[in-house]
UniProtKB/Swiss-Prot annotation:
Protein name per UniProt: LexA repressor
Gene that encodes the chain: lexA
DNA damage in keyword set: yes
DNA-binding region: 28-48
Subunit annotation: Homodimer.
Length: 206
């Protein structure tokens, strides 16, 4: 197997597609435009590495003479996976990711998880956040933290020890947890415990 960088893989795919659709390979300038490289010397460098790896053959005397060789299998770089805890219940007085709170673990690509941060997932029940694109039975991806800025969507523990997902606003003498549904009223609290900030949504199609 030949391991390629994303840029090299993009170049190789573009060359193959151009040969397939047009019958001849692209120029160096066209390759650069397709993959976002302004410098022709940078494109030449990538082509040289592809040639060294045995994936293409070039004729230096001709501007478009690039032949793709298919003898080797190209290995597409794979994302690392992070197993994120899915919280089944939120219990007051114990950490959100305590073992007794966790239903299962869900694998997410590492690019969806901020480096060095603690992240958990929570299933949404109800329609209080539909105008924010968060629907019943969705799973929110939450970065664990105990503070938030006004307007951020948070997981908060109310005075009744119930977890809720709402938009956070700190007013003069109280906290307003604002739903994103015009048919629902905000929750007004004197004290609230923030468990985390919502950074993503995962949805399955039924």
């Amino acid at each position: 197997m030949t391991k390629l960088s994303k840029r090299q893989l993009d170049i190789l795919r573009f060359i193959k597609e151009e040969v397939k659709t047009k019958g001849y390979p692209p120029s160096v300038r066209e390759i650069g435009e397709a993959v976002g490289l302004a410098s022709s010397s940078t494109v030449h460098g990538h082509l040289a590495r592809l040639e060294t790896k045995g994936l293409i053959r070039r004729d230096p005397t001709k501007p478009r003479a690039i032949e793709v060789l298919d003898e080797e299998e190209v290995q597409i770089p794979k994302s690392q996976v992070v197993n994120v805890p899915v919280i089944g219940k939120v219990t007051a007085g114990i950490p959100i990711t305590a073992v007794e709170n966790i239903d299962e673990y869900f694998p997410l690509p590492d690019r969806m998880v901020p480096p060095g941060e603690h992240v958990f997932m929570l299933e949404i029940m109800g329609e209080s956040m539909i105008d924010a694109g968060i629907f019943d039975k969705d799973y929110v991806i939450v970065k664990q933290q105990n503070t938030a800025n006004n307007g951020e969507i948070v997981v908060a523990m109310t005075e009744d020890d119930e977890a809720t997902v709402k938009r956070f606003y700190k007013e003069d003498n109280y906290v307003r947890l604002q739903p994103e549904n015009p048919t629902m009223e905000p929750i007004i609290l004197q004290n609230v415990s923030i468990l985390g900030k919502v950074i993503g949504v995962f949805r399955t199609v039924h």
